[in-house]
């Protein structure tokens, strides 16, 4: 198992955020605004879902990596820190999913 973490990925995105969009895909995505990052995340998520349904494990692995990368880019673009997302996941795992969903306020 690799030691590479989502925190490592977030640090990489942060380090490339202010670089030249002509030489960094991350900087290019960020320079085009959150809508572009959101669109790419959606595309990659659909591709991951298709790979899963087709039983394509290699495709699913590769598309899942793309989903995680584009999610971290979108979080950066939206000003949301990965630590905040992880804290929310930790909070949610402290109770059952059914109890957590029941405790949500109606939209």
From Swiss-Prot:
The keyword Amino-acid biosynthesis applies. GO terms for biological process: L-histidine biosynthetic process. The keyword Cytoplasm applies. Gene3D superfamilies: MazG-like. GO terms for cellular component: cytoplasm. It comes from Methylobacterium radiotolerans (strain ATCC 27329 / DSM 1819 / JCM 2831 / NBRC 15690 / NCIMB 10815 / 0-1). The lineage of its organism: Bacteria, Pseudomonadati, Pseudomonadota, Alphaproteobacteria, Hyphomicrobiales. Keywords: Amino-acid biosynthesis, ATP-binding, Cytoplasm, Histidine biosynthesis, Hydrolase, Nucleotide-binding. It is found in: Cytoplasm. It holds the Pfam family PRA-PH. Transmembrane segments: none annotated. GO terms for molecular function: ATP binding; phosphoribosyl-ATP diphosphatase activity. CDD domains: NTP-PPase_HisIE_like. PANTHER family: HISTIDINE BIOSYNTHESIS BIFUNCTIONAL PROTEIN (PTHR42945), HISTIDINE BIOSYNTHESIS BIFUNCTIONAL PROTEIN HIS7 (PTHR42945:SF1). Belongs to the PRA-PH family. Its EC number is 3.6.1.31. This is Phosphoribosyl-ATP pyrophosphatase. Pathway: Amino-acid biosynthesis; L-histidine biosynthesis; L-histidine from 5-phospho-alpha-D-ribose 1-diphosphate: step 2/9. It catalyses: 1-(5-phospho-beta-D-ribosyl)-ATP + H2O = 1-(5-phospho-beta-D-ribosyl)-5'-AMP + diphosphate + H(+).
């Amino acid at each position: 198992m690799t030691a590479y973490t989502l925190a490592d990925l977030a640090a990489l995105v942060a380090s490339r955020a202010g670089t030249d969009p002509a030489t960094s895909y991350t900087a290019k995505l960020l320079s085009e605004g959150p809508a572009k990052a959101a669109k790419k995340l959606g595309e990659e998520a659909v591709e991951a879902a298709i790979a899963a349904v087709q039983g394509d494990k290699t495709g699913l692995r590769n598309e899942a990596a793309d989903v995680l990368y584009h999610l971290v880019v979108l979080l950066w673009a939206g000003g949301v820190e990965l630590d905040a997302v992880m804290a929310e996941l930790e909070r949610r795992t402290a109770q059952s999913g059914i109890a957590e969903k029941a405790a949500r306020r109606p939209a």
